[in-house]
Amino acid sequence: MNKIFFTADLHFGHTNILKHQPNRPFAQEGDYILGDLTFFKSEDARHLLEKLPGQKFLVQGNHDGSIRAYSNYFKTTSQILDLTVKPTACPFLSENLMLTLFHYPMLTWNHKPYGSIMLHGHCHGKLDEHNRLSNDLPFDVGSDGELAKKAGGLVPLELIYETAMEKTGGVSFHQYAKNNYRSEVR
């Protein structure tokens, strides 16, 4: 089984990043980076990208301007990305898991009424409590959010799944969404 990891807001090259996040994670193989990978200018960004191992999937953030010139270092680059992860890829799943990846948090997203989970960065942990208390299924995977702190760095899909299952009380995401968003469909 391949482990799937998510992160955002690494801000490589930011002058204050080590002061605020001395133990920030570094990307591994097959990671989804939800924006703000680097503050480096174009040539320094290229040098950083050359050193990162494995396949990377970039959802662009507001500080990724210089990185757009180097999209060849990523398997995909996009503004928003919808994923479906199947139990055959991750045996801990009991059903297909739909994810929407975006740098910014959203109030509504594709497939939300059908149980999709929304992963974001940008907020530097400031929406963790809101995400926890919301009936929705958004999660901040930024390097300084509570999920990253709990995981010790990169946020594994398994932790997102477990946290979301706790939030739904063990009800499938599809049924949870039907109960919370689509009462007219019951």
Regions found by a protein language model. Give the residues of each.
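Short acidic/polar mixed-charge low-complexity motifs
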Residues: 2, 48, 95-97
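Conserved beta-sheet core of the metallophosphoesterase superfamily
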Residues: 57, 72-184
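Active-site glycine-centered loops adjacent to acidic/histidine catalytic or metal-binding residues
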Residues: 9, 36, 61, 121-122
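Glycine-rich, phosphate-binding/catalytic loops in enzymes
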Residues: 22-24, 47-52, 118, 134-139
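Short, glycine/acidic-enriched loop or turn micro-motifs at the edges of active sites
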Residues: 12, 39, 64, 106, ...
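Short catalytic/metal-binding and nucleic-acid-binding patches
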Residues: 17-19, 58-61
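Metal-dependent catalytic neighborhoods of phosphoester/phosphodiester hydrolases
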Residues: 35-52, 60, 65-81, 111-112, ...
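N-terminal active-site segment of His-dependent metallophosphoesterases
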Residues: 1-44, 141, 163-164, 185-186
